[in-house]
Design a protein with these regions (language model features):
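Exposed, low-structure sequence patches enriched in small/polar residues
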Residues: 1-200
Length: 200
């Protein structure tokens, strides 16, 4: 069955030294399902909205991953503080082929390596009151150089091998949109990530 998550965060001005009053609502749905004989998929859909004007650290700062360690719910080719939103939606999809292709190659069949594919996508907007990248902004703080909204969807995709020595996974990930260097930030259009977990 799908797993549904609802997060509600409230900031109350003048309560416990709070400087801003705002409300943040986030909804997520996670589901795993088999696609026989091609393996199984894990998918998560998430989205949210921030109400009222807030400084940019309280916006949704989309999770970039500048490390070599794989995070299923972060974007491997996105920089930290690259994109911010006050209304957003995202999808994180992983498909585990369980050796559907590699098991047809004799040496690979003996190694029991398994293929995995990923697609991650994000869309978000900023209302004028929170858009600190505008020249004549009404936002509380100006954005750091290179931070912007993600009104043009951000997409990355990858392929990987898991079950290496029974616990290592290696992913190669490509950034498919927003590929040019941005003001104040260098963009990586390709990343290699590693993770450790047991597959039985």
């Amino acid at each position: 069955f799908p797993i549904v998550g609802i997060d509600v965060v409230a900031g109350l001005k003048n309560i416990l030294n709070g400087d801003y009053e705002y409300y943040r609502l986030e909804l997520s749905v996670k589901h795993d399902f088999d696609i026989a004989p091609l393996g199984y998929s894990d998918i998560m859909l998430s989205g949210g909205k921030i109400f009222n004007k807030v400084p940019y650290p309280l916006l949704k700062l989309h999770e970039g991953n500048a490390t070599y360690f794989y995070d299923p719910y972060a974007f491997s080719c996105m920089n930290f503080y690259e994109f911010a939103s006050d209304l957003w939606g995202a999808v994180f999809w992983e498909h585990h082929f369980r050796g559907f292709f590699l098991s047809k190659i004799p040496l690979m069949k003996r190694l029991k390596w398994r293929e995995v594919a990923t697609v991650k996508a994000l869309w978000g907007t900023l209302s004028n009151k929170n858009n600190g990248s505008l020249l004549n902004t009404d936002a509380i703080f100006r954005f750091p150089e290179g931070m912007s909204s993600v009104s043009k969807p951000y997409v990355e995709a990858g392929v990987g091998i898991e079950n290496i020595f029974r616990f290592i996974r290696v992913d190669a990930i490509w950034r498919l949109t927003h590929r040019g260097d941005r003001s104040g930030q260098d963009v990586d259009n390709f990343a290699i990530n590693f993770s450790l977990h047991l597959n039985f």
